[in-house]
């Protein structure tokens, strides 16, 4: 049976960028990687209600810069910046260097695959029918400009004895096209019957300027050059051929 490669991993360096950007010597690499994992785990646990999409980590010149992409920046910052200052101190302790935290707002959470997956997971935990949750998320994404979306849920759906998977797709989701800007997200819903996994793929267009991922989209409409040639009366007359 065929298996799908991770859509982000296969596009790293082509149309996707890394979530951690730093260089380490051979002896420091493991410590840096472990610190990144601890920071991400801590932030996602403390900001579970803030709608965190992704966390970017950079280490420039013995400092650390953490960028949090969230749908609710007010929850992250807190009153007068108190909450974000506490987070900054905890991040500095985990990473062992002075840290700076930047907060970036996700303008359209309906087009962010990770936030869509977490939204479906929360609905399943509230005992909402999985088909209704899937179709609602698909409809919202297509309404806000997505070119395609696919949602897959797997587990004991509706409390069935035998686990199964169901998926729903609308539009195009070209996983084999490396220049396609495909956002991927995964979340788990903890229900009384067990864990239900949710995977979401969102196709936003094709990337041509890789320095600005997702900024430019390809025009998928078919070209019809004949319509742009004008009337026959507007064309210059061809010169007559000389007789041989």
Swiss-Prot record:
Ranges of Basic and acidic residues composition bias in the record? 216-244
Name the domain of life this protein comes from: Bacteria
A GO molecular function annotation here is: structural constituent of ribosome
Could you tell me the Gene Ontology terms of the biological process aspect for this record? Answer: translation
Q: Which Pfam families match?
A: KH_2, Ribosomal_S3_C
Give Gene Ontology CC terms.
Answer: cytosolic small ribosomal subunit
PROSITE patterns, sorted: KH_TYPE_2, RIBOSOMAL_S3
Keyword Membrane part of the UniProt annotation: no
Map out region (Disordered) in residue numbers.
Answer: 213-244
Q: Give all residue intervals belonging to the KH type-2 domain.
A: 39-107
Checking InterPro entries in the record gives: KH_dom, KH_dom-like_a/b, KH_dom_type_2, KH_sf_prok-type, Ribosomal_S3_C_sf, Ribosomal_uS3_bac-typ, Ribosomal_uS3_C, Ribosomal_uS3_CS
Q: Which UniProt keywords apply?
A: Ribonucleoprotein, Ribosomal protein, RNA-binding, rRNA-binding
Q: Does the keyword Repressor apply?
A: no
Q: How does it assemble?
A: Part of the 30S ribosomal subunit. Forms a tight complex with proteins S10 and S14.
Q: Which family does it belong to?
A: Belongs to the universal ribosomal protein uS3 family.
* Function description: Binds the lower part of the 30S subunit head. Binds mRNA in the 70S ribosome, positioning it for translation.
Q: What is this protein called?
A: Small ribosomal subunit protein uS3
Source organism per entry reads Xanthomonas oryzae pv. oryzae (strain KACC10331 / KXO85)
